[in-house]
Curated annotation (Swiss-Prot):
Membrane topology summary: Single-pass membrane protein
Quaternary structure and partners: PSII is composed of 1 copy each of membrane proteins PsbA, PsbB, PsbC, PsbD, PsbE, PsbF, PsbH, PsbI, PsbJ, PsbK, PsbL, PsbM, PsbT, PsbX, PsbY, PsbZ, Psb30/Ycf12, at least 3 peripheral proteins of the oxygen-evolving complex and a large number of cofactors. It forms dimeric complexes.
Alphabetical keyword list: Chloroplast, Membrane, Photosynthesis, Photosystem II, Plastid, Reaction center, Thylakoid, Transmembrane, Transmembrane helix
Entries under HAMAP family matching the protein: PSII_PsbL (MF_01317)
Location of the protein in the cell: Plastid, Chloroplast thylakoid membrane
Cellular component terms per the entry's GO annotation: chloroplast thylakoid membrane; photosystem II reaction center
SUPFAM superfamilies given in the database record: Photosystem II reaction center protein L, PsbL
Protein's name according to its UniProt entry: Photosystem II reaction center protein L
Function: One of the components of the core complex of photosystem II (PSII). PSII is a light-driven water:plastoquinone oxidoreductase that uses light energy to abstract electrons from H(2)O, generating O(2) and a proton gradient subsequently used for ATP formation. It consists of a core antenna complex that captures photons, and an electron transfer chain that converts photonic excitation into a charge separation. This subunit is found at the monomer-monomer interface and is required for correct PSII assembly and/or dimerization.
């Protein structure tokens, strides 16, 4: 029964890593767009 907690933590960690990945891609897209427009 106690194994459900680590699983929830791993899922939460995956969500946070996914959000950081999307944020990183968004920042890179903004930098590349500003670079091309300049």
């Amino acid at each position: 029964m106690t194994q459900s907690n680590p699983n929830e933590q791993s899922v939460e960690l995956n969500r946070t890593s996914l959000y950081w990945g999307l944020l990183l891609i968004f920042v890179l897209a903004v930098l590349f767009s500003s670079y091309f427009f300049n």
